[in-house]
Amino acid sequence: VLSAADKNNVKGIFTKIAGHAEEYGAEALERMFITYPSTKTYFPHFDLSHGSAQIKGHGKKVVAALIEAVNHIDDITGTLSKLSDLHAHKLRVDPVNFKLLGQCFLVVVAIHHPSALTPEVHASLDKFLCAVGTVLTAKYR
């Protein structure tokens, strides 16, 4: 459960992230594909080379969904319901991949905003990403 302080920390760090959705999303995806090669299996139709338009486009979608969740932080479940359906029923993405992508996203934020990612903000952002992952995997059960 996100506390009031967590919500403020997440909203604060996302003011720095929002203008870089495509860049940060693509970096997180590329990092995930390199670190966890098995995740590539969900993207057989993508050009997975560095800087590809498909990775940039999907990265932008990922971060846009996170921004939408931040904008509706008190109703992440309702906000991401359709996305949860898509990933559970149509795409059938292994739930562990949301955690892997979340970890990679945290690394990207740390690289670009080291001074803003204090231990408290890091913990809050991690809790938020875990909450998003929980929502996205809820329909698997």
UniProtKB/Swiss-Prot annotation:
Task: Specify which residues bind heme b according to the UniProt entry for this protein.
Answer: 87
Identify the residues that bind O2.
58
InterPro entries assigned to the protein according to its UniProt record, in alphabetical order? Globin, Globin-like_sf, Globin/Proto, Hemoglobin_a-typ, Hemoglobin_oxygen_transport, Hemoglobin_pi
A GO molecular function assigned to this protein is: peroxidase activity
Tissue distribution is: Red blood cells.
| Entry keywords, A to Z | Heme, Iron, Metal-binding, Oxygen transport, Transport
What is the protein's quaternary organization?
Answer: Heterotetramer of two alpha chains and two beta chains.
Q: What does this protein do?
A: Involved in oxygen transport from the lung to the various peripheral tissues.
- What's in the misc comment field? This alpha chain is from the adult major tetrameric component, which has been called hemoglobin A or AII.
Family from the record: Belongs to the globin family.
> What is the name attached to this protein's record?
Hemoglobin subunit alpha-A
Organism of origin is Phasianus colchicus colchicus
Identify the coding gene.
Answer: HBAA
